[in-house]
Amino acid sequence: MRHCIIFIVCISIVEIRTVHIEFIKEIVVIFRIVDHFSPFMLPCLLSHCKDGDTIIFVCQSVMKVRNISLWNKLVLVRHCVLLCAFLLSFFNVLHSIISICRIF
């Protein structure tokens, strides 16, 4: 079964605002993976998040994607930006590993 990936940027925990795509590259990326997302999980997820966190929801059906987008609180980002975010996260992790290796 194909999975739909939704990329969500939390600017404020109180009110999730939409973000212009060009701002995403400046956000420190923190990924939290949810296999089976339902709208009831959002308050629980937000209680563990900080302002500026990045969440990726992996949904099993397009219908769930449509249900989430109806809230008008979440921003859906194109796959190319999602790829850039993954690469940014990868290089940040790689840089951290190299920095730790230099210490030892």
From Swiss-Prot:
User: Which residues does UniProt call coiled coil?
Assistant: none
User: GO biological process annotations for this chain's record?
Assistant: protein targeting to vacuole
Origin, by domain of life? Answer: Eukaryota
Locate the transmembrane regions by residue number: 4-24, 80-100
Leader sequence segment: none
Give its localization.
Membrane
User: What is this entry's stated membrane topology?
Assistant: Multi-pass membrane protein
Q: Which UniProt keywords apply?
A: Membrane, Transmembrane, Transmembrane helix
What's any one GO cellular component for it? membrane
The record's misc note reads: Partially overlaps SFH1. Disruption phenotypes caused by deletion of this gene may also be a result of a defect in its overlapping gene.
User: What protein does this entry describe?
Assistant: Putative uncharacterized protein VPS65
